[in-house]
Swiss-Prot record:
One of its GO terms (molecular function) is N-succinylarginine dihydrolase activity. Substrate binds at residues 19-28, 110, 137-138, 214, 252, 362. It comes from the Bacteria. Homodimer. This is N-succinylarginine dihydrolase. SUPFAM superfamilies: Pentein (SSF55909). Keywords: Arginine metabolism, Hydrolase.
Length: 444
């Protein structure tokens, strides 16, 4: 049976804007108040997804969240007509309105943690939506995320869906952005690397001082239990608190893995060698640990260019390729390193560059935009086929974006009642295109 690693990219929502909501994310804060282009953002994401599909990769799309989120605004006391709710919130609590209009669900690396059937005791693919409790604008996503995932991976014979973890900082969970999987072949049992920022229940353990550690060890261990993983399938690694304080808010900003390759910065982890030894003990295959020295790429350059927020994919030919943002080309140190990497004795043979600047300016590169799902061909056949990228879906979604999306949006525009109508009309049509059913609150 054939096995693949599918990528499910987040479709950028109609309210994509730059409100600077993500403390600890340097790009998000530094680009606050820029004028965004939702239409361009959605099309950049679709172009990347289609390019991977054209390379023979299994590529899907995940629908965005409903925004503005009027249900949350009503929960916190704003009332009256929909237009009045927006008007009140804009006047009395503009930052709360901004949080309820964020298109951050485009970064599906934070949608959930996924464990493939080759690793789990019941032989099913497991999904746990991330609770994202550290950021208000993301903490309102998990229920809808769960519905979208269930509508996409709907066959209970193959897919096991869990609820998100308790909504408390002790179980702060940011999903696949702090999780990667090493293996020989995608269909073979592998080792899942759970990277955490702090131990919530141990006040003496190392933790960052400036920016929050969004992922706890307790959350990572809970997900491993839910997914029925054996101890021999798991390695728990602490991210270096110093790099979190330099803007590395998720592990996928400082490390990325694929099959038998782990590509990471030398400052990425604590106790790096000890953990590499544990991985080698638990995974009996030839492994490539590609450590990038600070002398060649400083942390600041890694964060600005998103060198590690790249995708490493294995093409159907067996060739391993890095999918990088064009920002990596524009950074001399990073571009020089990537050119050098191709001359080294590793499986990575090519770098492909994509323009995802609308996402990058909000702090999300190519790896943020995708949720990885290792699957066999029977599981791929059980996926909602209307979510899988092909020529027809690409054309239809581009027309849908042209029809419904603005090409200019400011934070002041978020109070425009017309945005509610535009967004709901677009999403209602999208659920028909992708055959998702009633996943949104306004449809229920």
């Amino acid at each position: 049976m054939k096995h693949f690693e599918a990528n499910f990219d987040g479709l950028v929502g109609p309210t994509h804007n730059y409100a600077g909501l993500s403390f600890g994310n340097v790009a998000s804060l530094s680009n606050a108040a820029l004028v965004s282009n939702p239409k361009a953002a959605a099309k950049q994401g679709l172009q990347k997804a289609k390019a991977l599909a054209d390379m023979g990769m299994v590529q899907g799309m995940l629908a965005p969240q409903e925004r503005p989120d009027l249900y949350t605004l009503r929960r916190i006391g704003f009332s009256g007509s929909d237009a009045n709710v927006l008007k009140q919130a804009a006047k009395e609590a503009p930052m709360l309105l901004n949080a309820c209009c964020s298109a951050s669900s485009m970064w599906t690396a934070n949608a959930a943690t996924v464990s493939p059937s080759a690793d789990t005791r019941d032989g099913k693919l497991h999904f746990t939506p991330a609770n994202l409790v550290d950021k208000l604008h993301r903490s309102i996503e998990p229920l809808t995320t769960g519905r979208i995932l269930t509508a996409t991976f709907s066959d209970p014979h193959y897919f096991h869906h869990h609820s998100h973890l308790p909504e408390h900082n002790s179980f702060g969970d940011e999903g696949a952005a702090n999780h990667t999987r090493l293996c020989n072949e995608y269909g073979h049992a592998g080792v899942e690397l759970f990277v955490y920022g702090q131990e919530a229940t141990n006040p003496n353990a190392p933790k960052p001082q400036k920016y929050p550690a969004r992922q706890t060890l307790e959350a990572s261990m809970a997900v491993a239990r839910l997914h029925q993983l054996e101890e021999d399938n798991c390695v728990f690694i602490q991210q270096n608190p110093d790099v979190i304080d330099q803007g590395v808010f998720h592990n996928d900003v400082i490390a990325v893995g694929n099959q038998n390759v782990l590509f990471y910065h030398e400052q990425a982890f604590l106790n790096t060698q000890h953990k590499i030894d544990e991985i080698k003990r638990k995974l009996d295959t030839e492994l490539y640990f590609i450590e990038v020295p600070t002398a060649k790429v400083a942390i600041n350059d890694a964060v600005k260019s998103y060198l590690f927020n790249t995708q490493i994919i294995t093409l159907p030919s067996g060739e391993m390729v890095i999918v990088a943002p064009t920002d990596c080309q524009e950074n001399p140190a990073v571009f020089a390193y990537l050119n050098e990497l191709l001359t080294l004795n590793t499986p990575i043979k090519q770098v492909l560059y994509f323009d995802v600047k609308q996402s990058m300016q909000n702090g999300g590169g190519p790896a943020c935009l995708r949720l990885r799902v290792a699957m066999n061909e029977m599981e791929v056949a059980a996926v909602n086929q209307h979510t899988l990228m092909n020529d027809a879906l690409f054309a239809r979604l581009n027309l849908w974006v042209d029809k419904h999306y603005r090409d200019r949006l400011t934070t002041q525009d978020l109070a425009d009642p017309q945005l509610i109508i535009e967004s709901r009309t677009a999403l209602d049509e999208l659920t028909q295109i992708m055959k998702l059913g009633s996943v949104y609150q306004f449809q229920r």
